[in-house]
């Protein structure tokens, strides 16, 4: 190329760049174009001179120059070359296409997505964290592999195209974790589903309309369907916040049907003319029609199993009542048994997992509600096939004085049953409605009436046998959307002076509930402060140890380190907030059409307040949800900042609390500014615990400025400790652990959990389990449980602790051992997959260290 032409090209291409396929940029070099043209002509066996090649190169440069851009894409350069070669020789054009396609293929095979797909399809399960990032998803099945490929592909797409560059880099580099990145642009996290509402009205399942439930069996079956359908339109957990209240009306329907059957049977041989109405009538097509007619009449007359049996005996033969109650109890047990089995077998999300379901219960003191609670726990206690522990649903028992905590409370016996069930089957977990940060949200209907009012009905006085007549209340003094009002017999007489009666009735869905993993909603700046029909939209987690590492490297004095740490934390809080808002706005562009069950069937609060078009976006509805900022690694953070051990050196515990309070204060301030529901979250950290630790170990593991601290305590474990939990390997008493961790529960209004591990076979030490639960309740914890090791040998049926050999049959083959363990809030354990085949590396290492959880 002569100097004049080269100078002309340089002038035209001054400061011009080429944007590569991977997004990077490089200086524009005409000589590369010249070499491509020359090679294409050679491959096509076209005769040419150097001058001709330089001329063609100049033509390509002219095309690019005419684009008037300082930076052109790699594809634009290729298109220009193809255009010039096509005019010279189609053979040369084809030769260039072949070379370019080969390079594109080689480049594609080196791409991250192809490497990930190879790992998913070909890696050995124990060596792949991608296949084990969720302990209850099967990454080695066809559906599991398919789901993982789609998941990992959408993660990469979102990082490149949807997440702002700054937040994408913070996620990739381990400052901030964007949870469920695979679903970032598609949907929301979790929901407390209004199951009772859909059981009463029926619903469209997508392939047909499901009729309203008429019995407890059909209600339980449809509950599983509702939870499965909703699970497919979100990515997180699905829960019922008051399962006993929701299902109790259908127990009553079964009772009336069973009573109708008994009355019909008695009418066959009774000479009492009053029983003639229970015989088959001329208008009844068959016996089923007769039973339906009788059942309908009983409902119209207000006959209920919640009515004291002594009163029912005045209306119907005692034998009929007793049998109807007994058969209803049997029906309820079978219904709960079927529900547990269905929720462990109905596959959702492309057949890769069952719904991550949770059922909150324990406060319904009616006969029907108590029957639901009793039989749900009975089904859990009995286990599934071969007596194995059910992984789902996660059962959560609500503790509340006056209802289910004290010995004098009507549901105290259910609390005792819950403790026995926990000792055998890990569940229920417990939630305290009475904790100082939960109790203020509880609401009651109240009414003061005078004796002699004409519109009266009977209400039971708590703890007494006599009945008091009180007025039926239809309205309340606070706004109601869809509050669930307890049955009439659940009115409490607060006081009675002989003339005036003061009453109250619990509005049960204002009592706290939680997802099994710990996520919850509480408070609402955009609607009623209820749980039903609401959920968490999304949460992002801040890597606190990373900020502490950088602060320790930068500053030598403890005071300066802590000051810098909080400055860095402020920056990350802003980024966490903005990244969540960005995510929220993206998903809220989706329409009712995208969510045929959630929105069109009215599961989300306010989604059916008015008529909606399928093209309407979901932004207004999603304002009922919460946005949460989580954190991880308080234990490691305190060590890095002070050199001391959190929970042992108590002088640094206040610093730990101040860090989380700083996050909570930020969330509260953001809520006021944005008028959105913001909350502080104690992150469960299943996959992120190992991910953050691995990234930080690679980056800082050999940093000389960290030589004065025991890095084995930080990086050697292979994971960071969950949220504010104490180091799992510490030998600490229950009381001490409560004192250290309880203050965080008041701060983490997006969710939290407390565990304490008891050793041995807890079925032989139920009293210790009960004492531990009471201590947690009295320690002002919000959500808590006892955890343990639980093993089963499916070869001989032994249950207990199995080390390497079954104590009963001597079996040494691990494939016969079911080792159920609690991974975060939920369980994992299967006869097909050992812990090492289902837990990621970080969680496997954590399991080996566990001493106090």
Predicted regions and their residues:
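Contiguous, well-ordered alpha-helical segments that form the cores/surfaces of helical PPI scaffolds
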Residues: 627-640, 661, 822
């Amino acid at each position: 190329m002569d100097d004049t032409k080269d100078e002309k090209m340089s002038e035209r291409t001054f400061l011009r760049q080429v944007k590569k396929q991977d997004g990077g940029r490089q200086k524009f070099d005409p000589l590369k174009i010249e070499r491509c043209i020359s090679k294409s002509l050679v491959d096509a066996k076209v005769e040419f001179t150097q001058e001709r090649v330089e001329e063609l190169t100049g033509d390509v440069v002219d095309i690019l120059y005419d684009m008037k851009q300082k930076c052109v894409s790699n594809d634009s350069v290729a298109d220009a070359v193809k255009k010039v070669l096509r005019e010279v020789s189609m053979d040369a054009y084809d030769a260039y296409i072949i070379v370019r396609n080969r390079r594109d293929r080689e480049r594609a095979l080196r791409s991250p997505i192809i490497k990930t797909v190879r790992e998913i399809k070909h890696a050995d399960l124990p060596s792949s964290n991608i296949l084990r990032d969720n302990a209850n998803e099967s990454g080695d099945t066809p559906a599991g592999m398919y789901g993982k490929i789609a998941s990992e592909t959408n993660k990469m797409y979102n990082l490149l195209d949807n997440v702002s560059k700054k937040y994408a880099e913070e996620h990739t580099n381990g400052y901030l974790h964007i949870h469920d990145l695979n679903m970032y642009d598609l949907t929301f996290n979790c929901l407390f589903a209004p199951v009772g509402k859909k059981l009463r009205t029926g619903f469209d399942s997508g392939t047909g309309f499901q009729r309203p439930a008429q019995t407890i069996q059909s209600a339980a079956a449809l509950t599983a369907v509702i939870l499965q359908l909703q699970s497919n339109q979100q990515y997180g957990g699905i829960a019922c916040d008051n399962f006993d209240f929701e299902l109790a009306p259908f127990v009553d329907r079964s009772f009336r049907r069973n009573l109708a059957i008994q009355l019909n049977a008695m009418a066959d041989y009774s000479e009492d003319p009053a029983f003639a109405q229970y015989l088959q009538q001329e208008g009844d097509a068959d016996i089923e029609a007769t039973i339906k007619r009788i059942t309908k009449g009983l409902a119209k007359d207000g006959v209920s199993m919640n009515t004291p049996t002594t009163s029912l005996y005045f209306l119907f033969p005692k034998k009929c009542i007793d049998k109807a109650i007994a058969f209803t109890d049997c029906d309820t047990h079978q219904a709960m048994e079927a529900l547990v089995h269905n929720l462990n077998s109905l596959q959702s999300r492309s057949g890769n997992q069952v719904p991550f379901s949770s059922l909150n219960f324990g406060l319904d003191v009616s006969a029907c509600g108590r029957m639901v609670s009793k039989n749900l726990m009975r089904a859990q206690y009995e286990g599934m096939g071969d007596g194995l522990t059910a992984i789902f649903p996660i059962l959560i028992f609500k503790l509340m004085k006056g209802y289910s905590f004290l010995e004098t409370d009507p549901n105290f016996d259910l609390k005792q049953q819950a403790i026995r069930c926990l000792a055998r089957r890990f569940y229920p977990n417990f939630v305290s409605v009475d904790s100082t940060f939960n109790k203020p949200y509880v609401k009651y209907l109240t009414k003061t009436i005078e004796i002699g009012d004409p519109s009266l009905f009977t209400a039971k006085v708590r703890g007494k046998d006599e009945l008091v007549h009180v007025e039926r209340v239809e309205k309340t003094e606070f706004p109601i959307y869809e509050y669930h009002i307890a049955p009439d017999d659940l009115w409490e007489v607060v006081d009675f002076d002989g003339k005036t009666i003061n009453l109250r009735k619990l509005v049960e869905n204002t009592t706290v509930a939680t997802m099994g993993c710990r996520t919850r909603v509480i408070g609402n700046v955009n609607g009623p402060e209820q749980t039903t029909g609401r959920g968490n939209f999304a949460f992002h987690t801040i890597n606190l140890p990373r900020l502490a590492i950088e602060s320790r490297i930068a500053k030598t004095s403890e005071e300066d380190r802590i000051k810098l740490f909080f400055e860095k934390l402020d920056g990350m809080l802003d980024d966490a907030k903005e990244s969540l808002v960005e995510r929220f706005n993206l998903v809220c562009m989706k329409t009712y059409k995208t969510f045929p069950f959630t929105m069109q069937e009215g599961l989300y609060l306010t989604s059916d307040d008015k008529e909606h078009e399928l093209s309407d976006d979901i932004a207004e509805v999603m304002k009922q949800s919460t946005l949460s900022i989580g954190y991880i690694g308080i234990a490691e953070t305190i060590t890095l900042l002070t050199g001391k051990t959190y929970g042992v050196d108590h002088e640094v515990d206040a610093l730990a609390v101040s860090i989380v309070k700083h996050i909570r204060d930020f969330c509260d301030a953001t809520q006021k500014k944005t008028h959105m529901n913001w909350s502080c979250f104690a992150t469960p950290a299943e996959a992120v615990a190992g991910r953050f630790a691995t990234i930080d170990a690679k980056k800082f593991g050999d940093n000389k400025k960290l030589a004065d601290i025991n890095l084995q305590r930080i990086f050697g474990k292979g994971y960071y400790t969950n949220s504010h939990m104490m180091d799992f390997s510490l030998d600490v008493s229950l009381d001490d652990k409560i004192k250290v961790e309880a203050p965080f529960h008041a701060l983490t209004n997006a969710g939290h959990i407390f565990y304490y591990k008891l050793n041995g076979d807890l079925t032989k030490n139920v009293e210790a389990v009960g004492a531990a639960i009471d201590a947690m309740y009295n320690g002002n914890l919000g959500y808590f449980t006892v955890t343990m090791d639980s093993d089963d040998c499916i070869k001989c049926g032994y249950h207990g602790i199995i080390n390497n050999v079954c104590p009963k049959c001597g079996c040494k083959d691990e494939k016969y051992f079911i080792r159920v363990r609690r991974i975060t809030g939920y369980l994992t354990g299967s006869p097909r997959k050992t812990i090492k085949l289902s837990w990621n590396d970080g969680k496997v290492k954590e399991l080996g260290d566990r001493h106090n959880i």
